[in-house]
């Protein structure tokens, strides 16, 4: 298996610290709002990578944190007149609801920064003791110049960064790029007692501390959105390696942005969507397949039209699954015949190709294409004449390949029939009202999904093609 390591800017053989085990840390949400589709892509991508590693036999210890104390949390809590803890409690609950709806598996542990205050204070104290940090008026800063390899993850040059950072710089800092690892209390802010007075941790130290305490000095994979590469992950490396003298993470994985209608998603452009808004209109399978239809290191463009296209493609897959489920009830032959054994072995090539693509830096886009190829093959060759054993095998294989992607696990019969009957009713109503455009649109939509309508003396019937 090969993974692209941001630290070295190349694909590397994936070799874990302990054979068969993966220690993985993913930067989670700051819990002051509902997560948006850009966050959703990050969560879906690393959920998929975790699932695939488990599919390949690894035991994965998967940690994803909650940032429940920082400037954004304090600002939002003050705006709505709540405490930071109340705000965090509320949006952690909302995160779990949306993540569950998106079929994201629960982490081994979701630590909250505020649960690790004692350990964070110890971490900061150790950095001061080792000469990597200094205190001024209750604030503690990390000295970037003391850490010789600062910038190695993002490819930034410290001297150039310092030149660019001289505007609005805190004059108390020894160098412009030094960053706060402990912040003294300001009026109205939550604070904890420390050797430097009342205060709270900086954002970067929180992740370093939680990773260290839950996974150890060196971890296999550290991951997050590409926007976190600098300064957040760069600063995590500096703090962690300064404290332990050991490599912090072996492999760094970063997922790319989601653009909306070819523009970067932002509230100011009014093109900002939460995952919850999208999940009200589309199933989790649709959103997951859309998020995984491009390579995780490549930006994807989001639009409702693209989601509709993904839904139509997914419907075709589920139509085929539905046909197989029906065949399972209808076929007469129970056991695999000799001539079917060869075909069953041929189907294994799809699994082999799927693994080959996913083993190459988790290429979900190509893996999805292989599932489509498999289903096209099965649609042609698995029929009412096939044995029950072959039909069941093909169904199990499709679900097996869908499982690491978090898709194609539903039983389709009832839900598909109910949805189609509802659309037929809507079309009948449109025809009675002489709304021919809507009636034609519904018919064309069904046809695109492989459903053909037939007028019979008993009324409208539908069949799959």
Swiss-Prot record:
Originating species: Clostridium botulinum (strain Hall / ATCC 3502 / NCTC 13319 / Type A)
Motif 'HIGH' region location, chain numbering: 29-39
Gene name of the record: cysS
Keyword Metal-binding attributed: yes
The organism's place on the tree of life at top rank: Bacteria
GO CC list: cytoplasm; cytosol
Free-text remark on how the cofactor is bound: Binds 1 zinc ion per subunit.
Gene Ontology biological process: cysteinyl-tRNA aminoacylation
Subcellular location: Cytoplasm
SUPFAM superfamilies: Anticodon-binding domain of a subclass of class I aminoacyl-tRNA synthetases, Nucleotidylyl transferase
InterPro entries in UniProt: Cys-tRNA-ligase, Cys-tRNA-synt_Ia_DALR, Cys-tRNA/MSH_ligase, CysS_C, Rossmann-like_a/b/a_fold, tRNA-synt_1_cat_dom, tRNAsynth_Ia_anticodon-bd
Protein name per the record: Cysteine--tRNA ligase
Motif interval(s): 'KMSKS' region: 264-268
Transmembrane segments: none
Residues the entry annotates as binding ATP: 267
Entry-linked HAMAP family: Cys_tRNA_synth
Molecular function GO labels: ATP binding; cysteine-tRNA ligase activity; zinc ion binding
A Pfam family recorded for this sequence: DALR_2
The keyword Ribonucleoprotein is annotated on this UniProt entry: no
Binding of Zn(2+), residues: 27, 207, 232, 236
Binding partners and assembly: Monomer.
EC number in record: 6.1.1.16
Keywords: Aminoacyl-tRNA synthetase, ATP-binding, Cytoplasm, Ligase, Metal-binding, Nucleotide-binding, Protein biosynthesis, Zinc
Signal peptide: none
Subcellular location, principal: cytoplasm
Catalytic activity: tRNA(Cys) + L-cysteine + ATP = L-cysteinyl-tRNA(Cys) + AMP + diphosphate
SMART domains for the chain: DALR_2
Listed cofactors: Zn(2+)
């Amino acid at each position: 298996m090969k993974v692209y390591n941001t630290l070295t800017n190349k694909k590397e053989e994936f070799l874990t610290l302990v054979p068969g085990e993966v220690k993985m840390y993913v930067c989670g949400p700051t819990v002051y709002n509902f997560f948006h589709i850009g966050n959703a892509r990050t969560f879906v991508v690393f959920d998929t990578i975790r699932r695939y590693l488990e599919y390949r036999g690894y035991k994965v210890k998967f940690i994803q944190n909650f940032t429940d104390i920082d400037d954004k949390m304090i600002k939002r809590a003050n705006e709505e007149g709540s405490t930071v803890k109340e705000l965090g409690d509320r949006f952690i609950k909302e995160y779990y609801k949306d993540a569950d709806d998106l079929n994201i598996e629960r982490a081994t542990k979701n630590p909250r920064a505020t649960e690790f205050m004692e350990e964070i204070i110890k971490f900061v104290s150790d950095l001061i003791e080792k000469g990597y940090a200094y205190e001024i008026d209750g604030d503690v800063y990390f000295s970037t110049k003391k850490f010789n390899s600062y910038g190695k993850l993002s490819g930034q040059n410290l001297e150039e960064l310092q030149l660019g950072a001289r505007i609005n710089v805190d004059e108390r800092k020894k160098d412009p790029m030094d960053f706060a690892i402990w912040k003294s209390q300001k009026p109205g802010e939550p604070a904890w007692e420390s050797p430097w007075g009342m205060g709270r941790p900086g954002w970067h130290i929180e992740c370093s501390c939680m990773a260290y305490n839950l996974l150890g000095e060196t971890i296999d994979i550290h991951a997050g959105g590409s926007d976190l590469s600098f300064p957040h992950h760069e600063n995590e490396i500096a703090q962690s390696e300064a404290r332990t003298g050991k490599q912090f993470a072996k492999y760094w994985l970063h997922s790319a942005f989601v653009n909306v209608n070819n523009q970067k998603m932002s509230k100011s452009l009014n093109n900002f969507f939460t995952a919850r808004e999208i999940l009200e209109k589309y199933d989790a399978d649709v959103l997951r397949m859309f998020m995984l239809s491009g390579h995780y290191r490549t930006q994807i463009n989001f639009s409702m039209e693209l989601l509709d296209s993904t839904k139509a493609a997914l419907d075709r897959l589920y139509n085929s699954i539905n046909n197989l489920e029906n065949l399972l009830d209808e076929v007469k032959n129970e056991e695999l015949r000799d001539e079917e054994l060869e075909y069953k072995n041929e189907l294994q090539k799809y699994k082999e190709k799927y693994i080959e693509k996913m083993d190459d830096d988790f290429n979900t886009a190509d893996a999805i294409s292989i599932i489509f190829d498999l289903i096209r093959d099965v649609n042609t060759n698995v029929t009412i004449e096939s044995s029950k054993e072959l039909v069941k095998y093909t169904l199990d294989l499709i679900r097996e390949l869908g499982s690491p992607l978090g898709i194609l696990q539903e039983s389709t019969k009832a839900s598909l029939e109910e949805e189609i009957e509802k659309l037929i009713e809507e079309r009948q109503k449109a025809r009675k009202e002489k709304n021919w455009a809507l009636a034609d649109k519904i018919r064309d939509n069904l046809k695109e999904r492989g459903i053909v309508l037939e007028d019979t003396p008993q009324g409208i019937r539908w069949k799959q093609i």
